Amino acid sequence: DLVRSRGLGDVYKRQFLHWCKRMKYSDNEVYALYGCKEPTYGDPFYLTSEERNVLYDADLSENPKLAVIRDIFVFHCYIGCRVGDLYRLTRENIKDGFLEYMPQKTKKCQAKTVRVPLHEKALKILERYDVNADRLFPFKPIHTYNLGIRELLKYCGIDRMVTILDTHGYNTVQKPLHEVASSHTARKTFVGNLYKQVPDPNLIASLSGHVEGSRAFRRYRTIDDDMKRKLVEMIN
């Protein structure tokens, strides 16, 4: 049963069994007889630029804690990094209007500095916070951040239904966006909206910190209805 389980767990278990063999804890190689399926992913869901702007423009003066979550999340939507990299950022990462950082996840296989030009709205968000602080924002634990994102979207009426895969990865279900959003939604919002404008995986990867040729971009190649209409309108 161990080697037949599906999804990401299968990958981790195979790695663990390889490690046991290297450490000479076991010489049983029965796991090598089984294939390892790639994890199943659905089409990515993310905020449209209009939905992101609703958050940016929302009056949260009566809810200062949610206002901080909003600032972090919208800023995150404009830079597209992984949440672990976001939490490491300081003012020293900002140089001449660019955000510079080295993604921790890929630095061993591709040690490249990512440079992201900061959008005007991202710069305005930063102006609200102490330039002498240790970090860009007063971050909370990631779990708290994720819960705050969902509360924020619900508060602002971002309730569009999105299609996701269930926990087994085989059946699709419909959920309101505010029930399933997380810190990773900010990264997908950055990539998804860029991909609509310039469907060039390598160019976007240079901004998002993905490794060149990343399989993640396969998920963004489903052309939406608006892009289809634009293509048809180009036919004379």
Which stretches of residues belong to each language-model region?
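Conserved tyrosine-mediated DNA breakage-rejoining catalytic core shared by Y-recombinases
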Residues: 35, 79, 88-127
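C-terminal catalytic core of Y-nucleophile DNA break-rejoin enzymes
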Residues: 41, 107-170
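Long, amphipathic, Lys/Arg-enriched alpha-helical "connector/arm" segment
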Residues: 39-67
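Short, polar N-cap/turn motifs at the start of nucleic acid-interacting alpha helices
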Residues: 92-97, 199-219
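Short, charged phosphate-coordinating catalytic segments
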Residues: 17-29, 76-97
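Catalytic-site neighborhood detector that most strongly recognizes the C-terminal catalytic loop/helix
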Residues: 105-107, 142-145, 208-234
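Single conserved hydrophobic/aromatic residue that forms the stacking wall/gate
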Residues: 1-12
